[in-house]
A protein has these predicted regions:
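Residue-level hotspots at or immediately adjacent to binding/recognition sites across diverse folds
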Residues: 10, 19-371
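N-terminal export signals
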Residues: 1-17
């Protein structure tokens, strides 16, 4: 199991004078990357990369007080983030994104009306796609992933039952799989380990609150025991195998008045039981988890309420976790929602917002770690 938690300051190295024949080294540690063009308040909820010159990030913009915002989608072209046009679609936010190439990506979100929306990127624009349950008030799509055969997996619910929506890579044939055999369950994250093994995370009612939920689909459902907690939701997970699963999330408002920030939850399944591991800080949240190019667990993105001057990460070092801080002065109080690896490199992206409050002047925010 995990050992002691250490700390490391994510300071970047400044420029140095070099001979003309010696390449200037890349900056070390996490670096802020501008994500211009969004209307405050804005945030990026999820990010996915197909390579060093192609990534997508989605969220919302234009929030002001209790009013709903507008969906936000950004595209990385290898040198800059660009806001993509969603004016022809009526959506209040996008919740997740997954892509494979410059002409193929998928996103799920919330329209102005009822139900959930499924969007497809064709290399030029986002367009709505139809699926079983589209437009129904009791249908929700919360997360999307694409496997190595470019088949699309989404988790959510239909008719009050949580489950998976599965589609071929062309987006022509969709079907809901057998419902998850858990009552009062919500699924917030889907992760593909292989085309035949898909994991989901979320929460389930425990009578007085809710516990963390993790399950595996490999042609049939295997539901792991609940992750114990009073009001605990799983935001993301990394499965190295049936007996080696890490899950992250937040236990909401424990030990304080209403509105108190939650507690970060870092949990490990060893095939027999869940173990809660100290996250290195006690008040805040953990939102994203990412493996490296070899599939080994590498990074967790978080938010440390007790020190908001920089972004906060957990880095996996062998059997131990290390707290790593992002760049200084990049944002007033950066809040990270997600982290993902960059295929073909040893790099990573993270996304979120410039402060933990989704109200003006908060803006969309991204950081990158180069190999």
């Amino acid at each position: 199991m995990a050992g002691a938690i250490g700390t490391f300051s994510g300071l970047a190295l400044g420029p140095a004078t070099a001979r003309a024949d010696v390449p200037t080294p890349r900056a070390q540690g996490w670096q802020a990357v501008p994500a211009p063009g969004s209307t405050p308040a804005a945030q990026l909820r999820r990010v996915d990369a197909a390579g060093p010159r192609l990534a997508w990030a989605v969220g919302e913009e234009g929030r002001a007080g209790p009013s709903q915002g507008r969906a936000l989608a950004m595209l990385w072209n290898g040198s800059a983030w660009t806001k993509t046009d969603l004016a022809h679609l009526g959506h209040t936010r996008l919740l997740d994104v997954a892509g494979t190439c410059s002409a193929a990506a998928w996103s799920v979100g919330q329209p102005v009306g009822t139900g959930s929306a499924l969007l497809r990127w064709d290399g030029t624009t986002w367009r709505e796609a139809t699926f079983p349950g589209a437009g129904e008030t009791n249908t929700r799509l919360n997360s999307v992933a694409v496997d190595s055969e470019r088949r699309v997996w989404m988790c959510g619910s239909r008719g009050g039952a949580a489950g998976l929506l599965y589609g071929d890579g062309g987006g022509e044939v969709w079907r809901w799989l057998e419902p998850l055999p858990v009552a009062s369950a919500n699924l917030y994250r889907v992760v593909v380990r292989s085309p035949d093994e898909v994991w989901v995370g979320g929460d389930q009612s425990n009578g007085g609150g809710w516990s963390g939920l993790v399950a595996r689909w490999d042609g049939a459902w295997t539901v792991l025991p609940p992750v114990a907690g009073l009001r605990l939701s799983i935001a993301d997970l990394h499965a190295a195998g049936p007996d080696d699963v890490w899950a992250v999330g937040t236990e909401a408002g424990i030990g304080g008045p209403p509105g108190r920030p939650g507690n970060p939850a870092l949990c490990h399944w060893d095939g027999t039981a869940w173990t809660r591991v100290e996250a290195g800080f006690t008040v805040g949240s953990l939102g994203g988890i990412a493996g490296d190019a070899q599939g080994r667990l590498a990074w967790v993105s978080g938010w440390n309420y007790q020190d908001q001057s920089r972004s906060t990460y957990l880095r996996r070092d062998g059997d131990a976790w290390t707290v790593v801080r992002g760049p200084a002065g990049a944002a007033p109080a950066p809040y990270l929602n997600d982290v993902t690896s960059v295929p073909g490199t040893g790099g990573f992206w993270s996304v979120g917002m410039t402060s933990p409050t989704p109200a003006p002047p908060t803006e969309a925010y991204t950081e990158r770690l180069d190999a």
